[in-house]
């Protein structure tokens, strides 16, 4: 028995019986829903019209009426159908419009416009000058002047500035004793830059150049009447103008003042890879940046000769400098070489460290740097940041021929350095070095001794065994002096005779060591200074000394270098006083007075916040008093020497 389900019945009514009901009353349309709304989206293929296109010619019958839905539809890719449809529509559109390509078939000359060109072009003759020509004529003095780079330090209306009167002494041949020049410069300019600006303004004002270069001149304190204080030290070329409160300065040529050319010094620059470059410096007032650039130049020349394969590589030049004896203290590249108080430097790459690198090995490394700045109990000075380092870099053949016997000028020996927290040692410190010498006595025979340098003192003790001695050696005196009481050392060649080996003499100068009770009663908790030295040792007529002898020049240089390095690092008041005693010819009190006068710049100079229009009358009286006092002391020195 057959069975017809509901869906089959509906399909028959929709697709078969409905065709017979079209001409009738439309009962099926009213009872059944529209099949278009019920059919599945995409149920018919896209080409169902084209497949039965041959039936189109029979009449106007619709395509939908005769399409048969297949039982199974194969998937059809629509890409080819869409492309064919688009191509057909495009072809029909082109055919309808009747478009044709517009190509030019005429001569090519008609496409261009002919124009006559006259070369070279004729320049119009004009008597008026352009703005560039007028600017070059107005500023030709600055543009062609070798000192034109210093014009940028001129005062402006927006930045803080300072007005200074410059006294320029003239030669004896001219009728005018000096010339004055008023300048106004930025407070951020350094002294060496102000000197260059003065030379530029001198040329623009008087239409003549001053002889020499910028490095040949120094600033001294002066007064408005033309008097220059030559007794006082010159201003540090690395200082800023804002740090100097004087409104009247004297521009003095150091070559004319000294009567000869500048003495060259050898400065060594080390890299961490142990490359060393020795640079001759004729002026220690040059900035450290110049020294760094010279080291880079020498390094590049060496690399080209030694490692030609690395010529094309880019070398990173971001380095900073440290003194060889001072670890972890960056130097200001704009400061002068003399302000570093060292003749050897280390180049360290930025964001890096030299660790324990030292050119002379481990015993001069970071541990020595920390130990040599310690403060002993009852020490006259606080610990300083400088670390002593043996160095003999002077090109002078005789060590004792320097200005004060310490390897650097007097003006450099009194510079103040910042103090660091002190550390206390309970023992006498370890041994740094030792030398075998002969101790000289005024009345007794000389005897063989050991000169020992320790962290806190130097000692002269009897040599362990001396079988060559004829007399009994019970008179040898053990000498031990802390570094704080040592004034200095002097080396000299003994009277040389033909056919005899050179004998060198080393003389140490010091002051009596005070007892703990004296230090506690007289000084107390106060810091040692030159005033206390002059007060405590007022009854001392001369410096105590001991003389040693040796045949070895290398040992002499090492003793001289190590002693000066240690004293320079500690920078004690007794050391400052001795540097003004002419190697012990003046008494300790007189030497301390001279040292006080030389350091008077720090006392009388006003602060940087003081107004720049302060009068020079008050300071002028102080300068005259100091000059007269120094003249009297110098006269006393001459009488004592006679």
From Swiss-Prot:
Region Disordered: start-end pairs: 603-642
Biased composition annotated in UniProt, kind: Low complexity: 605-615
GO molecular function: phosphatidylinositol-4,5-bisphosphate binding
One protein family per Pfam: CRIM
InterPro entries in UniProt: CRIM_dom, Sin1/Avo1, Sin1_N
Coiled coil: none
PANTHER family, sorted: TARGET OF RAPAMYCIN COMPLEX 2 SUBUNIT MAPKAP1
Family statement: Belongs to the SIN1 family.
Assembly and binders: Component of the target of rapamycin complex 2 (TORC2).
Protein name: Stress-activated map kinase-interacting protein 1 homolog
Source organism of the structure: Caenorhabditis elegans
UniProt lineage: Eukaryota, Metazoa, Ecdysozoa, Nematoda, Chromadorea
